[in-house]
């Protein structure tokens, strides 16, 4: 018996297919897989879902078109002429600070490692495990979201270089774990920290949720990842600098200087991108994101992995994290929340502000020669006075 039903491929579906084909790359990035033009919408429920998603897509498209950073740019494949000089300068700073894991001398660290107390070794190994995993998460966000959304060439240059540096950071932390930890089972436990350590998993999940949130706008996610690099890393950086103050682990502490400088620059760049946004998240939204990150970091370093294990004061560490959060809020253009002083004098010149003199000091001479100099600095003359 032949059916009298009309085919499912109706005029409505053809319209859907046409709309899908005409969508820009940015729209497709935010489009659920179920809206593929090859997928048949076989029920009223599915059609309703599509209509709602289409409305959200149009709203997002309007927001994208209003943002110069996200607006489709046909000139994005060529760098010159420079349009955003402040963003380009950030890229050149990142380029000038390039280094590799092979340049860090770990030969003296093993002797120090063996002389540490058990609780000190426990703390350091767990902090390194968090760091080794977190840089990969930052890269996941850059590859999956930011580099696909941002259309400004200068910013794409920075993100591309940041990806390379995050890989070097992750390699460095993995190398440190490989050097210090001789037991293969313990090494495997540390390398898989996101699955094996609940305290690390909580921080990782927070960041991963922001990557996967298709409804969160770019501005909110920029703030979230500024918090990851500016707050989630800050307490752990401070704990390793505390070891430096005690004259311990020279290889670990030197690599920590290099990495904290890099992360400071990455955090500054996030704040710069935020300032370029036309439609910024509200102050309430920004402060909610920052304060949530502060709570998680305070719990991490005073409860889950307390800094008292290495002789630091937990209350002062809480205060330091609040101080760092206030500084980040100021850089984003908002008022402080916590209004506390920096309790760690040894962190005064090692802040997470890439624009401080910490960067200009060329730590360990790791600023590439000539990269930050102007073209006139490279001229040859014979008019020197003798």
From Swiss-Prot:
Cofactor(s) for this UniProt protein: Fe cation
Region (Disordered): 1-36
Catalytic reactions of this protein: a 2'-deoxyribonucleoside 5'-diphosphate + [thioredoxin]-disulfide + H2O = a ribonucleoside 5'-diphosphate + [thioredoxin]-dithiol
InterPro entries referenced in this protein's UniProt entry, alphabetically: Ferritin-like_SF, RNR-like, RNR_small, RNR_small_AS, RNR_small_fam
Stretches with biased composition (Polar residues): 1-24
Keywords per UniProt: Cytoplasm, Deoxyribonucleotide synthesis, Iron, Metal-binding, Oxidoreductase, Phosphoprotein
Top EC class for this record: oxidoreductase
Broad class of the protein's primary localization: cytoplasm
Binding site for Fe cation 1: 135, 166, 169
SUPFAM superfamilies attached to this UniProt entry: Ferritin-like
UniProt cross-references to PANTHER family, sorted A to Z: RIBONUCLEOSIDE-DIPHOSPHATE REDUCTASE SMALL CHAIN, RIBONUCLEOSIDE-DIPHOSPHATE REDUCTASE SUBUNIT M2
Record-given protein name: Ribonucleoside-diphosphate reductase subunit M2
């Amino acid at each position: 018996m032949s059916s009298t039903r009309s085919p499912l491929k109706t005029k409505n579906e053809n319209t859907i297919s046409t709309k899908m084909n005409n969508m820009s790359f940015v729209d497709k990035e935010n489009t659920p897989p179920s809206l593929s033009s090859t997928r048949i919408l076989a029920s009223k429920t599915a059609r309703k879902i599509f209509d709602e998603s289409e409305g959200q897509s149009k709203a997002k498209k309007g927001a994208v078109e209003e943002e110069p950073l996200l607006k489709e740019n046909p000139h994005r494949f060529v760098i010159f002429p420079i349009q955003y000089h402040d963003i380009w300068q950030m890229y050149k700073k990142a380029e000038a600070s390039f280094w590799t894991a092979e340049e860090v001398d770990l030969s003296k660290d093993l002797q120090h490692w063996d002389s540490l107390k058990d609780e000190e070794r426990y703390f350091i190994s767990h902090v390194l495990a968090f760091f080794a995993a977190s840089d990969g998460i930052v890269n996941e966000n850059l590859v999956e979201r930011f580099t696909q959304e941002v259309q400004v060439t200068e910013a794409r240059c920075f993100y591309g270089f940041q990806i390379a540096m995050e890989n070097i950071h992750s390699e460095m932390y993995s190398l440190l774990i490989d050097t210090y930890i001789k037991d293969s089972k313990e090494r495997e436990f540390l390398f898989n920290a996101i699955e094996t350590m609940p305290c690390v998993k909580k921080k990782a999940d927070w960041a991963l949720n922001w990557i996967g949130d298709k409804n969160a706008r770019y501005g909110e996610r920029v703030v979230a990842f500024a918090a990851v690099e500016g707050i989630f890393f800050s307490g752990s950086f401070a704990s390793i600098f505390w070891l430096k103050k005690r004259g311990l682990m020279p290889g670990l502490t030197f690599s920590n200087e290099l990495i904290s400088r890099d992360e400071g620059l990455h955090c500054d760049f996030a704040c710069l991108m935020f300032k370029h946004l036309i439609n910024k998240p509200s102050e309430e939204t920004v402060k909610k994101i920052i304060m949530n990150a502060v709570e998680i970091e305070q719990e991490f370093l005073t409860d889950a992995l307390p800094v008292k294990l290495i002789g630091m004061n937990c209350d002062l560490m809480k205060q330091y994290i609040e101080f760092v959060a206030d500084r980040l809020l100021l850089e984003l253009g908002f008022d402080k929340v916590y209004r506390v002083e920096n309790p760690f004098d040894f962190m005064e010149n090692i802040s997470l502000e890439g624009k401080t003199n910490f960067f200009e000091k060329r730590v360990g001479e790791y600023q590439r020669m000539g990269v930050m100099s102007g073209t006139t600095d490279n001229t040859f003359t014979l008019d020197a006075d003798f």
